[in-house]
Amino acid sequence: ADLLDVYLSEREASPRYVESLKRTVKHARTCGLLDTSQLLPEKVNEFLTRLPLAAVTRSNIRRELLTLWRFAFEHSYTDVPPLRVCRIKAAPPPPRAWSLDTLRTLLAAAEKDERPVSRRIPGLLWRDVLPCWIVIGYDTGLRLSDLLHLHESNIVNGCVICTAQKTGKFTVRSISPAGQELAARLFKRSPDGTLFRWALPRRRALGKWKDFLREQQIVGSSRWLRRSGATYVEIKRKGEAQKFLGHSNAALATRHYLDQTLTMDIPESPPPLR
């Protein structure tokens, strides 16, 4: 953990990246990698092999651990270079997103959900919160952490203006008239000016989405709002999804966000046999 503190003291890092690095260090310490003297190829390979996590997650942990190890080597905290660490093949599954029909089904169901959000907020129902989340999430493509941190001051001239928690990038996204109306209603009830956070801690938000989608028998998660928004932006104007998502690498959108069954960016089919 001391190495991580030194590493972070010498560079700027987004809150999400800091959280991710801390999780990686916690995993390493739990598995016996307690200090820089134990950063050895055989120990790191054993650690990565034994992690009971998906290949994509283990690949991310490997990358972050090598980053810290390289920093330790360059600053003479260890004389062992970060070499001979086995690669982890982690091919992400093809990205999926919701169609407009599915999004409208979700929105209609959310508007009818009359269950209370929390005992501590009498009178606040899910139909007051969830439709706003769906529309704003789809309109803006903001990540969960950014949605939760939205404040009334972030809404200007029909747009969201904020700094992305994960990347630290300045972000401006337009909101549809329906989204503006839903947000205005919710802001009137907010005691602290936040749009969602006053009523929805992160854990409750994730739990509600999981339960809501299971009840509707619809596959996905709240992050599919970002994918769906990006997919339909790409359909509307090819190449625009990268800007919508705030990516500096154009390949990320295609690899992780755009549902090609919706964009129809697929090869021509051969002639039918019948």
List PLM regions with ranges.
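Active-site/catalytic core of tyrosine-dependent DNA strand-transfer enzymes
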Residues: 176-219, 234-237
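Phosphate-coordinating loops and pocket residues in cytosolic domains that bind phosphorylated ligands
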Residues: 41, 108, 149, 157, ...
